[in-house]
Amino acid sequence: MIEGFYFFSGRGMDSGTTVYAKNRKTSGLIGRLNLVSHPFCILLIVHFCMKDYSTPFLTRFSRLFKMLLWLFSTVRRIRRLDKASVEQRNAEFSAICAEALSILNVRLIASNRPSESLKGVLVVANHISLLDIFAITALCPSSFIAMKELSRWPVIGRVARNADTVFIDRSNRKDINIINEAICRSLAEGKNVCFFPEARTSSGNGILPFKEALFQSAIDAGSEIQPLALRYFDSQKRRTTQPSFSEVNLFVSLWRIVSMQEIEVHVDFLPLEKPQGDRYEVKDKIEAAIGREVGKIHEVLAE
């Protein structure tokens, strides 16, 4: 839910969305907008009704323009990695994602990061924002498990395919077995594989229930699991949900990110886990560990 707004749509996004505001300045019906034809209108409304005006309007558009250039540059850079080694690919992807975070003025803070590079581990993290993948890849380059719909996104889908992303149809249980086999092969080749067991994004103040299916791959491959806990803070070092991709569309999520003066993403590396027991037991243990870390609320961090 966007601060200051409720979005309602009777017949879906293609038919338009009625937007209401709940603050005094924009009370009542603002208008009926077609999100497909006029996504820019949504961005303007969010801009004028967001509480944080610290980032100039031109700075926001500058960040968006630089991200567009970054995206097309990334497509070219990834094409050159076809014959690269795992180490070379990891180094390049780490650099690519660090550049994206820099453009968006996102500070990456890692805690308890292993001194040696991880190889052949299953990386598991809570999912909050579009920035999660950039943050994780900058620190721990991995192939990602993503929803099948992402493969159809313009440009981004192409980048994801070239980055060895494995796409999954969660409605097809047979597809889960195929994905687990693919993960096992990647782990055996010394590649890291990352997935978000919540299966969707949360606000970031807690975690959603984990799905157990893909934990089977670590058991079958005999690979260790690296749990990661992600938390976001604003320029005042207060916990924030603004970067969250939960319940908003891509345009609004990206606009909220570029509108923040500065973002801090804290990535806590929890102790490596050797899977023991069945996938349900493994899931429960990892879920509890990440949940405890994400649930640590600090209004103001120590300097």
Give short role names for the model-derived ranges.
Residues G157, N205-D284, V300:
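A cross-family acyltransferase "interaction/gating" segment
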Residues V19-G31:
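Short, low-complexity, charge-dense intrinsically disordered segments
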Residues H47-I109, R158-N162, M260:
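A transmembrane-helix-recognition feature enriched in membrane-embedded lipid enzymes
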Residues W70-K83, S102-L104, S117-R173:
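Catalytic core of membrane glycerolipid acyltransferases/transacylases, capturing the structured
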Residues Y6-F8, S15, L29, L35, ...:
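Short hydrophobic targeting helices and cationic amphipathic motifs
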Residues S186-F215:
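Catalytic-site beta-strand/loop segments enriched in glycine and acidic/polar residues
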